[in-house]
Amino acid sequence: MRAKAPPSHEMIRRIQQGLRFHELEVLQDNIDIPLEELAAKLAISRSTLQRRKTAGRLLPDESDKLMRFSRLLDHATDIFGDVDKARAWMKHPQRGLGGVSPLDYAETEMGAREVENLLGRIDYGVYS
């Protein structure tokens, strides 16, 4: 069972301060992709990734993107009832996203909303 998410105002404050680098590593482990690949999805270069690791903290915009992926993985886990199924779904091309994987689609906020819409349709049994 996952821990209860903190209230929105607390998450917003944490994002504005910049999340700890460790939270990037936790999401990387949960999604099960290489750290450099996740960083690229967050628009973080290799050299910047090393600087963030040394500093121990992400910038607010990077933190916001990190939370976007975390939120989608949580939503997919709720829908599929299992983190392994959610993880597999997030990595594979989906017809409802034009043959693009949810991880790739969610690199933008608009794409993330489409992934959330698709998860909602799956939850209600509308797979198109």
In which residue ranges do the predicted regions lie?
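Non-transmembrane "mature" sequence context
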Residues: M1-S128
